[in-house]
């Protein structure tokens, strides 16, 4: 188990460390943003494939089928493609355009890096993501500008941003609630 943190580079580094340990498979798991309007915070997505500007990576079908069958007996899950972005997909407009361009149902920032390493090393790949923010959610400025690569706020700047723009506080609490639902579903 390796906690990569947020973003392509962090995930790439973690996946390389795991392959050095001679693993035979990689799992990308964590939270994602919905770009399909039918998804809500807490929903589980099993990726059929990962899409990014560099390519299209399929997950391991038999592994995906077994996990999907098991999880379906516990709760409803969604199967579809996940687009992996190097930048945060911050607004509902960005999410809409990404959905239209890719037909994916969710967006994350790590799975393509893990998929690249799995593909390069002929490793099985499974991608499990839970939804933290729905397609209509816009990520507040304090979160975008004042959190580290583990999602933790840089307190002083975060608080100053909230004081400068207090309207975002409600959105921060809504995002936190969705994130908590996503983590609980994992």
Give each language-model segment a name:
Residues 1-186:
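Glycine-rich phosphate- or other oxyanion-binding loops that anchor nucleotides, phosphorylated ligands
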């Amino acid at each position: 188990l390796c906690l990569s943190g947020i973003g392509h580079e962090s995930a790439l580094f973690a996946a390389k460390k795991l392959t050095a340990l001679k693993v035979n498979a990689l799992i990308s798991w964590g939270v994602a943003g919905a770009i399909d309007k039918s998804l809500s915070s807490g929903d589980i997505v099993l990726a059929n494939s990962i899409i990014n500007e560099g390519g299209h990576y399929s997950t391991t079908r038999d592994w995906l089928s077994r996990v999907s069958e098991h999880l379906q007996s516990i709760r409803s899950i969604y199967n579809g493609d996940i687009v992996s972005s190097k930048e945060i997909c911050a607004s509902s407009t960005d999410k809409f355009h990404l959905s239209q361009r890719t037909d994916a149902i969710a967006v994350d920032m790590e799975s393509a890096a893990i998929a690249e390493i799995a593909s390069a090393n002929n490793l099985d790949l499974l991608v499990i993501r839970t939804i933290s923010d729905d397609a209509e959610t816009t990520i507040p400025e304090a979160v975008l500008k004042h959190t580290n690569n583990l999602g933790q706020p840089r307190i002083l700047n975060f608080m100053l941003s909230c004081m400068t723009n207090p309207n975002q506080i409600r959105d921060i609490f809504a995002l936190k609630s969705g994130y908590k639902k996503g983590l609980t579903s994992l």
